[in-house]
């Protein structure tokens, strides 16, 4: 049972920096997701976000990103989707350490938003997948919550703007991906507007391009394929 759990579910290690010891780095290796507990401190997390010029940094975001590395091995590498992955995200056999060093030295390309969900996603195909995976989890979680509260949105329809109930992405049968896309933009606009009404920053400070949506669709299709097998 333990081996089966390790195959399909990641393990977690919440560690803290110790005086004189090595720095604890958030990451994934060998099925274990390591998180530095300093990321749970609001002030420290904000400091790191500003230092790295990130628009969004949360503990939940870290968990979702690192789980993407875990599930890439199981759903893409072991799931027979490597060729399709490489056609869309690039070749993950590129030198990972060199790619990250180049990213931190030079930054993302100026047109990064055309094909990526975030600037960090440009660093390497593995990071592109993990960032896209995290955004997909953000999307389905927020849509599911909105659906549970019977939220209705005004969305474009065949005869103009129509009122539409938010779909539950975990319903059976699952709603089409295009439905999730159609509802995502107005839902995040609503969410951000509610935050601004209370003097808070945008909860979802991203604008996704058609290229980024193609990658999100790949994640969705990968999850649906695994769920039905």
Predicted regions: what is each one?
Residues 62-74:
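Catalytic glutamate of the conserved HExxH
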Residues 48-54, 115, 172-177:
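Glycine- and acidic
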Residues 1-42:
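Auxiliary, metal-adjacent structural segments of Zn-dependent hydrolase domains
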Residues 35-46, 98-111, 162-166:
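Active-site-adjacent bridging/hinge elements
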Residues 43-63:
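Short pre-active-site segment immediately N-terminal to the catalytic Zn-binding motif
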Residues 28, 56, 60-64, 123-126, ...:
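Active-site-proximal structural scaffolding
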Residues 72-143:
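Post-HExxH zinc-binding segment in Zn-dependent metallohydrolases
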Residues 121-229:
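Pan-zinc metallopeptidase signature
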């Amino acid at each position: 049972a333990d081996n089966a759990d390790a195959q399909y579910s990641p393990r977690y290690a919440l560690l803290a920096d110790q005086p004189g010891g090595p720095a604890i780095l958030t990451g994934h290796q060998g099925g274990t997701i390591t998180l530095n507990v300093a990321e749970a401190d609001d002030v420290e997390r904000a400091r790191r976000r500003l230092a790295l010029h990130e628009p969004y940094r949360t503990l939940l975001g870290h968990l979702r990103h690192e789980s993407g590395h875990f599930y890439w091995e199981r759903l893409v590498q072991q799931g027979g989707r490597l060729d399709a992955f490489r056609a869309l995200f690039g070749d993950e056999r590129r030198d990972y350490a060199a790619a990250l060093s180049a990213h931190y030295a030079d930054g993302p390309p100026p047109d990064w938003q055309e094909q990526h969900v975030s600037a960090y996603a440009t660093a390497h195909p593995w990071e592109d997948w993990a960032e896209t995976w995290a955004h997909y989890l953000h999307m389905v979680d927020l849509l599911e919550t909105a659906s549970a509260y019977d939220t209705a949105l005004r969305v474009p329809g065949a005869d103009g703007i129509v009122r539409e109930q938010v779909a539950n992405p975990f319903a059976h049968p699952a709603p089409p991906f295009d439905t999730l896309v159609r509802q995502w933009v107005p839902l995040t606009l609503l969410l951000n507007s509610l935050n601004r009404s209370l003097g808070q920053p945008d909860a979802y400070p991203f604008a996704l391009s058609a290229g980024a949506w193609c990658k999100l669709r790949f994640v969705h299709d990968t999850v649906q394929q695994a769920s039905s097998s």
